[in-house]
Protein backbone atom coordinates (compact mmCIF):
# COMPACT_ATOMS: atom_id res chain seq x y z
CA UNK A 1 0.00 0.00 0.00
CA UNK A 2 1.46 3.33 -1.03
CA UNK A 3 1.89 5.80 1.80
CA UNK A 4 1.09 9.42 1.09
CA UNK A 5 3.84 11.72 2.32
CA UNK A 6 3.15 15.04 4.01
CA UNK A 7 5.42 16.76 1.48
CA UNK A 8 3.06 15.61 -1.31
CA UNK A 9 -0.07 16.53 0.66
CA UNK A 10 1.41 20.00 1.31
CA UNK A 11 1.88 20.72 -2.40
CA UNK A 12 -1.76 19.72 -3.09
CA UNK A 13 -3.12 21.57 -0.04
CA UNK A 14 -1.43 24.80 -1.14
CA UNK A 15 -3.81 24.97 -4.10
CA UNK A 16 -7.01 24.38 -2.12
CA UNK A 17 -5.97 26.28 1.04
CA UNK A 18 -7.02 23.52 3.42
CA UNK A 19 -5.58 20.36 4.96
CA UNK A 20 -6.99 16.83 5.34
CA UNK A 21 -9.06 16.21 8.48
CA UNK A 22 -6.56 13.73 9.97
CA UNK A 23 -4.02 16.58 10.34
CA UNK A 24 -6.44 18.93 12.12
CA UNK A 25 -5.97 18.87 15.89
CA UNK A 26 -8.91 18.84 18.28
CA UNK A 27 -10.06 22.35 19.19
CA UNK A 28 -8.47 22.39 22.65
CA UNK A 29 -5.11 21.41 21.11
CA UNK A 30 -5.07 23.88 18.21
CA UNK A 31 -2.11 26.24 18.54
CA UNK A 32 -4.20 29.38 18.18
CA UNK A 33 -6.28 28.33 21.22
CA UNK A 34 -3.80 26.47 23.42
CA UNK A 35 -0.71 28.70 23.16
CA UNK A 36 0.03 31.65 25.45
CA UNK A 37 0.33 34.47 22.89
CA UNK A 38 2.69 37.41 23.13
CA UNK A 39 5.06 35.53 25.44
CA UNK A 40 8.17 33.89 24.00
CA UNK A 41 10.20 31.92 26.52
CA UNK A 42 13.94 32.36 26.63
CA UNK A 43 15.15 28.79 27.03
CA UNK A 44 18.26 28.84 29.29
CA UNK A 45 21.51 29.41 27.37
CA UNK A 46 24.70 27.81 28.71
CA UNK A 47 28.21 28.67 27.49
CA UNK A 48 30.22 25.44 27.47
CA UNK A 49 33.51 27.32 27.00
CA UNK A 50 33.27 28.90 30.47
CA UNK A 51 36.44 28.10 32.43
CA UNK A 52 34.39 27.70 35.62
CA UNK A 53 33.15 24.09 35.38
CA UNK A 54 31.24 24.38 38.65
CA UNK A 55 29.20 27.20 37.12
CA UNK A 56 28.38 25.08 34.03
CA UNK A 57 27.37 22.15 36.25
CA UNK A 58 25.07 24.41 38.29
CA UNK A 59 23.41 25.88 35.19
CA UNK A 60 22.92 22.48 33.49
CA UNK A 61 21.51 20.98 36.67
CA UNK A 62 19.14 23.89 37.33
CA UNK A 63 17.88 23.96 33.72
CA UNK A 64 17.33 20.18 33.78
CA UNK A 65 15.31 20.39 37.00
CA UNK A 66 13.27 23.49 36.12
CA UNK A 67 12.88 23.22 32.36
CA UNK A 68 14.09 19.89 30.98
CA UNK A 69 15.54 21.86 28.06
CA UNK A 70 18.44 24.25 27.49
CA UNK A 71 20.64 25.61 24.70
CA UNK A 72 24.41 25.28 24.60
CA UNK A 73 26.76 27.71 22.83
CA UNK A 74 30.52 27.54 22.25
CA UNK A 75 30.03 23.77 22.27
CA UNK A 76 33.07 23.01 20.13
CA UNK A 77 31.31 21.83 16.94
CA UNK A 78 32.37 24.19 14.12
CA UNK A 79 29.52 26.08 12.43
CA UNK A 80 30.70 24.69 9.09
CA UNK A 81 30.16 21.09 10.27
CA UNK A 82 26.59 21.95 11.30
CA UNK A 83 25.96 23.87 8.07
CA UNK A 84 27.03 20.86 5.98
CA UNK A 85 24.80 18.54 8.03
CA UNK A 86 21.85 20.84 7.32
CA UNK A 87 22.75 21.24 3.65
CA UNK A 88 22.85 17.51 2.85
CA UNK A 89 19.65 16.83 4.83
CA UNK A 90 17.78 19.58 2.99
CA UNK A 91 19.13 18.26 -0.32
CA UNK A 92 17.77 14.77 0.45
CA UNK A 93 14.24 16.04 1.08
CA UNK A 94 14.34 18.05 -2.16
CA UNK A 95 15.07 14.91 -4.23
CA UNK A 96 12.33 13.44 -6.45
CA UNK A 97 9.85 11.41 -4.40
CA UNK A 98 10.78 8.07 -5.99
CA UNK A 99 14.42 8.56 -4.98
CA UNK A 100 13.49 9.23 -1.34
CA UNK A 101 11.31 6.10 -1.34
CA UNK A 102 14.41 3.96 -2.09
CA UNK A 103 15.33 4.19 1.60
CA UNK A 104 11.76 4.09 2.95
CA UNK A 105 11.11 2.13 6.12
CA UNK A 106 10.12 -1.37 4.96
CA UNK A 107 6.42 -2.06 5.58
CA UNK A 108 5.93 -4.08 8.75
CA UNK A 109 9.53 -3.46 9.84
CA UNK A 110 10.17 -3.38 13.59
CA UNK A 111 13.12 -1.06 12.99
CA UNK A 112 12.64 2.68 13.25
CA UNK A 113 15.28 3.40 10.59
CA UNK A 114 14.46 4.73 7.14
CA UNK A 115 12.42 7.44 5.42
CA UNK A 116 8.81 7.66 6.59
CA UNK A 117 5.82 9.59 7.80
CA UNK A 118 3.81 7.86 10.52
CA UNK A 119 5.89 7.14 13.61
CA UNK A 120 3.72 5.83 16.41
CA UNK A 121 0.10 5.20 17.30
CA UNK A 122 -1.57 8.51 16.58
CA UNK A 123 -3.82 10.01 19.25
CA UNK A 124 -7.46 9.85 18.10
CA UNK A 125 -6.28 9.01 14.58
CA UNK A 126 -4.62 12.43 14.19
CA UNK A 127 -1.33 12.79 12.31
CA UNK A 128 1.63 15.13 12.62
CA UNK A 129 2.42 17.48 9.68
CA UNK A 130 5.90 16.01 9.18
CA UNK A 131 7.97 13.53 7.18
CA UNK A 132 11.17 12.10 8.63
CA UNK A 133 14.36 10.14 8.07
CA UNK A 134 15.87 8.01 10.84
CA UNK A 135 19.27 6.33 10.87
CA UNK A 136 21.91 5.51 13.48
CA UNK A 137 25.17 7.48 13.29
CA UNK A 138 27.13 5.90 16.19
CA UNK A 139 28.61 3.50 17.30
CA UNK A 140 29.93 1.95 14.05
CA UNK A 141 28.57 -1.48 15.03
CA UNK A 142 25.01 -0.05 15.09
CA UNK A 143 25.16 1.71 11.72
CA UNK A 144 23.15 0.36 8.78
CA UNK A 145 24.16 2.32 5.69
CA UNK A 146 21.15 0.90 3.83
CA UNK A 147 19.16 3.75 5.38
CA UNK A 148 21.66 6.52 4.63
CA UNK A 149 20.91 8.50 1.46
CA UNK A 150 23.34 7.90 -1.44
CA UNK A 151 22.34 11.31 -2.71
CA UNK A 152 23.71 13.88 -2.17
CA UNK A 153 27.14 12.20 -2.34
CA UNK A 154 28.43 14.31 0.59
CA UNK A 155 25.67 12.99 2.90
CA UNK A 156 27.76 10.26 4.54
CA UNK A 157 30.83 12.39 5.17
CA UNK A 158 28.76 15.26 6.65
CA UNK A 159 26.93 12.93 9.06
CA UNK A 160 30.06 11.03 10.10
CA UNK A 161 31.91 14.26 10.83
CA UNK A 162 29.00 15.57 12.91
CA UNK A 163 28.78 12.25 14.83
CA UNK A 164 32.50 12.38 15.60
CA UNK A 165 32.28 15.97 16.92
CA UNK A 166 29.07 15.37 18.86
CA UNK A 167 30.55 12.66 21.08
CA UNK A 168 32.66 15.04 23.17
CA UNK A 169 29.66 17.35 23.69
CA UNK A 170 27.50 14.39 24.78
CA UNK A 171 30.15 13.04 27.17
CA UNK A 172 30.43 16.46 28.79
CA UNK A 173 26.65 16.83 29.11
CA UNK A 174 26.40 13.47 30.88
CA UNK A 175 29.26 14.50 33.17
CA UNK A 176 27.59 17.82 34.09
CA UNK A 177 24.27 16.06 34.76
CA UNK A 178 26.07 13.58 37.06
CA UNK A 179 28.06 16.19 38.98
CA UNK A 180 24.88 18.28 39.35
CA UNK A 181 23.46 15.54 41.59
CA UNK A 182 26.76 14.90 43.44
CA UNK A 183 27.33 11.63 41.60
CA UNK A 184 30.47 10.17 40.03
CA UNK A 185 31.15 11.88 36.65
CA UNK A 186 30.27 8.77 34.60
CA UNK A 187 27.07 7.86 36.46
CA UNK A 188 24.57 8.99 33.82
CA UNK A 189 26.57 7.83 30.82
CA UNK A 190 27.15 4.39 32.35
CA UNK A 191 23.51 4.20 33.42
CA UNK A 192 22.46 4.86 29.82
CA UNK A 193 24.75 2.24 28.27
CA UNK A 194 28.28 3.68 28.42
CA UNK A 195 30.22 3.34 25.16
CA UNK A 196 27.39 1.26 23.66
CA UNK A 197 25.05 4.27 23.77
CA UNK A 198 23.27 4.56 20.39
CA UNK A 199 23.21 7.89 18.52
CA UNK A 200 19.98 7.90 16.47
CA UNK A 201 19.72 10.73 13.93
CA UNK A 202 16.30 11.94 12.86
CA UNK A 203 15.65 14.61 10.26
CA UNK A 204 12.23 16.21 10.63
CA UNK A 205 10.79 17.89 7.54
CA UNK A 206 7.73 20.09 8.16
CA UNK A 207 6.58 21.49 4.79
CA UNK A 208 4.69 24.80 4.58
CA UNK A 209 1.13 24.30 5.83
CA UNK A 210 -1.80 26.38 4.47
CA UNK A 211 -3.53 26.15 7.88
CA UNK A 212 -0.81 26.33 10.54
CA UNK A 213 -3.50 27.45 13.00
CA UNK A 214 -5.02 23.93 12.85
CA UNK A 215 -2.02 21.58 12.57
CA UNK A 216 0.57 20.57 15.16
CA UNK A 217 3.26 18.04 15.82
CA UNK A 218 2.26 15.48 18.46
CA UNK A 219 3.02 16.67 22.02
CA UNK A 220 5.48 14.29 23.65
CA UNK A 221 8.53 13.72 25.80
CA UNK A 222 11.54 12.03 24.19
CA UNK A 223 12.12 8.44 25.29
CA UNK A 224 15.90 8.89 24.88
CA UNK A 225 18.37 9.67 27.66
CA UNK A 226 19.05 13.08 26.15
CA UNK A 227 18.38 14.58 22.72
CA UNK A 228 20.70 17.07 21.04
CA UNK A 229 18.97 19.03 18.30
CA UNK A 230 20.05 21.32 15.46
CA UNK A 231 17.16 23.49 14.17
CA UNK A 232 16.95 25.44 10.91
CA UNK A 233 16.14 29.16 10.88
CA UNK A 234 12.34 28.68 11.08
CA UNK A 235 11.10 28.69 14.70
CA UNK A 236 8.49 26.18 15.79
CA UNK A 237 9.27 24.67 19.19
CA UNK A 238 6.73 24.94 21.99
CA UNK A 239 7.36 23.86 25.58
CA UNK A 240 4.78 23.04 28.25
CA UNK A 241 5.69 24.92 31.41
CA UNK A 242 3.66 25.75 34.50
CA UNK A 243 0.46 24.43 32.90
CA UNK A 244 0.71 26.37 29.61
CA UNK A 245 2.21 26.03 26.12
CA UNK A 246 4.78 28.68 25.18
CA UNK A 247 6.70 29.47 22.00
CA UNK A 248 10.45 29.14 22.48
CA UNK A 249 13.18 31.25 20.98
CA UNK A 250 16.39 29.72 19.62
CA UNK A 251 19.65 31.56 19.36
CA UNK A 252 21.84 31.10 16.25
CA UNK A 253 24.48 28.34 16.27
CA UNK A 254 23.26 26.87 19.56
CA UNK A 255 22.50 23.19 20.09
CA UNK A 256 19.17 22.51 21.80
CA UNK A 257 19.37 19.86 24.54
CA UNK A 258 16.23 18.00 25.67
CA UNK A 259 16.26 15.92 28.82
CA UNK A 260 14.63 12.61 27.86
CA UNK A 261 12.70 9.98 29.79
CA UNK A 262 15.75 7.82 30.60
CA UNK A 263 17.59 10.66 32.39
CA UNK A 264 14.40 11.48 34.30
CA UNK A 265 14.21 7.80 35.33
CA UNK A 266 17.92 7.56 36.26
CA UNK A 267 17.67 10.79 38.29
CA UNK A 268 14.61 9.35 40.08
CA UNK A 269 12.58 12.35 38.95
CA UNK A 270 15.04 15.10 39.93
CA UNK A 271 15.61 16.01 36.27
CA UNK A 272 12.53 16.53 34.11
CA UNK A 273 11.90 15.09 30.66
CA UNK A 274 10.62 18.07 28.65
CA UNK A 275 7.05 17.92 27.29
CA UNK A 276 7.15 19.67 23.92
CA UNK A 277 5.52 19.94 20.51
CA UNK A 278 6.12 21.67 17.20
CA UNK A 279 4.15 24.23 15.23
CA UNK A 280 4.29 24.64 11.46
CA UNK A 281 4.67 27.65 9.19
CA UNK A 282 2.45 28.86 6.35
CA UNK A 283 5.25 30.10 4.10
CA UNK A 284 8.41 28.27 5.10
CA UNK A 285 9.70 24.75 5.53
CA UNK A 286 10.84 23.97 9.04
CA UNK A 287 13.51 21.32 9.54
CA UNK A 288 15.33 19.95 12.57
CA UNK A 289 18.09 17.40 13.18
CA UNK A 290 17.63 15.78 16.61
CA UNK A 291 20.06 13.06 17.67
CA UNK A 292 18.53 10.78 20.30
CA UNK A 293 21.05 9.30 22.74
CA UNK A 294 19.50 5.92 23.44
CA UNK A 295 20.51 2.95 25.59
CA UNK A 296 21.12 -0.32 23.68
CA UNK A 297 17.84 -2.31 23.44
CA UNK A 298 18.73 -4.91 26.11
CA UNK A 299 20.30 -2.42 28.52
CA UNK A 300 18.37 -2.06 31.78
CA UNK A 301 17.64 1.50 32.93
CA UNK A 302 16.37 2.45 36.36
CA UNK A 303 16.94 5.01 39.11
CA UNK A 304 20.63 5.36 40.03
CA UNK A 305 20.98 3.54 43.40
CA UNK A 306 22.65 6.52 45.14
CA UNK A 307 19.50 8.59 44.47
CA UNK A 308 17.18 6.08 46.15
CA UNK A 309 16.69 5.83 49.93
CA UNK A 310 13.91 5.62 52.51
CA UNK A 311 12.96 9.26 52.07
CA UNK A 312 13.25 9.01 48.27
CA UNK A 313 11.96 5.59 47.20
CA UNK A 314 12.30 4.57 43.54
CA UNK A 315 9.68 6.40 41.46
CA UNK A 316 10.29 4.27 38.34
CA UNK A 317 10.71 0.60 37.48
CA UNK A 318 14.03 -0.71 36.19
CA UNK A 319 13.45 -2.22 32.75
CA UNK A 320 15.11 -2.99 29.44
CA UNK A 321 15.12 0.00 27.10
CA UNK A 322 13.42 -2.00 24.32
CA UNK A 323 10.52 -2.79 26.70
CA UNK A 324 10.23 0.87 27.70
CA UNK A 325 10.22 1.93 24.02
CA UNK A 326 7.59 -0.66 23.09
CA UNK A 327 5.23 0.57 25.81
CA UNK A 328 5.81 4.22 24.90
CA UNK A 329 5.26 3.79 21.15
CA UNK A 330 2.14 1.68 21.69
CA UNK A 331 0.67 3.96 24.36
CA UNK A 332 0.84 1.24 27.02
CA UNK A 333 1.41 1.89 30.74
CA UNK A 334 5.03 1.63 31.93
From Swiss-Prot:
Residues 196-295 form the Fe2OG dioxygenase domain. It is found in: Cytoplasm. Pfam families: 2OG-FeII_Oxy, DIOX_N. One of its GO terms (biological process) is coumarin biosynthetic process. PROSITE patterns: FE2OG_OXY. Its main location: cytoplasm. Pathway: Secondary metabolite biosynthesis; flavonoid biosynthesis. Its cofactor is Fe cation; L-ascorbate. Transmembrane segments: none annotated. Catalyzes the formation of flavonols from dihydroflavonols. It can act on dihydrokaempferol to produce kaempferol, on dihydroquercetin to produce quercitin and on dihydromyricetin to produce myricetin. This is Flavonol synthase/flavanone 3-hydroxylase. It comes from Eustoma exaltatum subsp. russellianum.
Amino acid sequence: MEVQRVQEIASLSKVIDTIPAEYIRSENEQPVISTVHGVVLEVPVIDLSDSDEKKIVGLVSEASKEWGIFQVVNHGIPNEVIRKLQEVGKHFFELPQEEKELIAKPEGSQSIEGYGTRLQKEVDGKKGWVDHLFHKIWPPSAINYQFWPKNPPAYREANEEYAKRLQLVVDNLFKYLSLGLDLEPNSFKDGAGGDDLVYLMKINYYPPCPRPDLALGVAHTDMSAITVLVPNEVPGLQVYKDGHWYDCKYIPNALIVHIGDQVEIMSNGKYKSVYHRTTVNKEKTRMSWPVFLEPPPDHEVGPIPKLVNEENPAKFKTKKYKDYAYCKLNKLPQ
